[in-house]
A protein has these predicted regions:
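Glycine-rich phosphate/diphosphate-binding loop of Rossmann-like nucleotide-binding domains
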Residues: 4-34, 40-41
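Short beta->alpha junction loops
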Residues: 40-49
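Proline/glycine-rich low-complexity loops and linkers
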Residues: 50, 60, 78-174
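Conserved acidic residues
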Residues: 63
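Short glycine-/aliphatic-rich beta-strand segments at the starts of folded cytosolic domains
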Residues: 175-190
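Short amphipathic alpha-helix segments
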Residues: 189-207
Length: 221
């Protein structure tokens, strides 16, 4: 069975345009390689009400929801709390993760762990923990009412490491299907004549989703 996914990026800095949402494109490519169709990208600020609304919409139309961001130690990092409220899951403290965060601070920062980092060791009950070897924000995944929810950190390097090491193996276990994608690169042709050339071939494909896009390269002086 194929799965449909929605990626929800959490962070007011994304909406303000201070940071480009590169995570979404990277996650989409990785999910398509394991047969998960990404149908929606959503961006919400660090606001629990708007995130809750986005999650309620996503759970009605997708069976995989993947969030990035909002797993830090500050007051506006509310992804786990909001996800748990939306799906009726209690937050529980994982002592093993708390000890891991304390050790990370001692070894890498040479400081005692600040108390507000304690919330990074709280997780939905009965979830799978995704270790974070390059930061203090572990991710996690759980299934509720037929929907798989995965939460990854926002910083791209941390997200990428966790995506490759944990999220993709988790999703690969859900389905044996794959999405086959081919790129055809041309030059000197506009989109309209290219469509005429490809129409017959596309009509012979099974369940195709053709997409065209153009790129203009200006001569340099």
């Amino acid at each position: 069975m194929s799965h449909t996914a929605e990626i929800i990026a959490v962070g007011t800095e994304l909406l303000l345009g201070n940071i480009t949402n590169t995570n979404a494109s990277e996650i989409s490519r990785a999910l398509s390689a394991v047969g998960v169709n990404v149908f929606w990208h959503t961006v919400v600020g660090d606001n629990p009400e708007r995130l809750r609304e986005a999650l309620k919409i996503a759970r009605k139309r997708a069976d995989v929801i993947l969030t990035t961001g909002g797993l830090g130690p500050t007051y506006d990092d509310l992804t786990k709390q909001t996800v748990c409220e939306t799906f009726g899951k209690p937050l529980v403290l994982r002592e093993d993760v708390l000890e891991h965060i304390r050790t990370y601070f001692a070894r890498n920062v040479h400081l005692v762990m600040p108390e507000n980092n304690r919330q990074q060791a709280e997780f939905p009950a009965d979830c799978v923990i995704f270790d974070n070897p390059v930061g203090t924000a572990p991710g996690c995944a759980f299934e509720a009412e037929g929907v798989h929810v995965l939460m990854l950190p926002g910083p791209p390097f941390e997200m990428r490491t966790m995506l490759q090491n944990w999220a993709i193996p988790y999703l690969r276990g859900l389905s044996k299907e794959v999405i086959v994608s081919h790129d055809i690169m041309t030059f000197g042709l506009g989109e309209s004549p290219m469509e005429d050339l490809m129409r017959e071939r596309i009509s012979q494909m099974e369940n195709p989703s053709p997409v065209s896009y153009t790129h203009l390269t200006l001569p340099t002086t």
